[in-house]
């Protein structure tokens, strides 16, 4: 039977999601910025040998502040989660993908433009976009699709953490996560 594997640091959020969803959920309480978490997921994949139909890389780390003021641990966090973890999860899952599988990487509209006070975050999202496009081309002959989703600001807990210093004082608009999910699902259903 189909099973949804969900990775998050928060055990409470994972338990709540497991109770909320009508499908079997395997809660994996891992911190994807940690190498041991990525190794544990790779080992679980090797042990279970699942038929992966969809991978969604939606974890995100951001810090909005002047470039020179961003703490080294925040730089490492953005690179580790937004780039390294996403890349290694894609690589770990690929042996279990087949024709019709899809990898969905959440990038950002920030991937396309300079973002003052969000330079490092935007750079990591440009990486996600470029990687998704290139790997998508590589996997085309196997009929495994890679979709980069590039939403505008979205109403999540992310902004409370990323903009803790309050350097961004005005957001033109904030999209509802359900709207982004519907648009993503519609894009996933397209066969191109």
Predicted region positions:
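Substrate-binding pocket helix/loop in short-chain dehydrogenase/reductase
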Residues: 66-67, 71-77
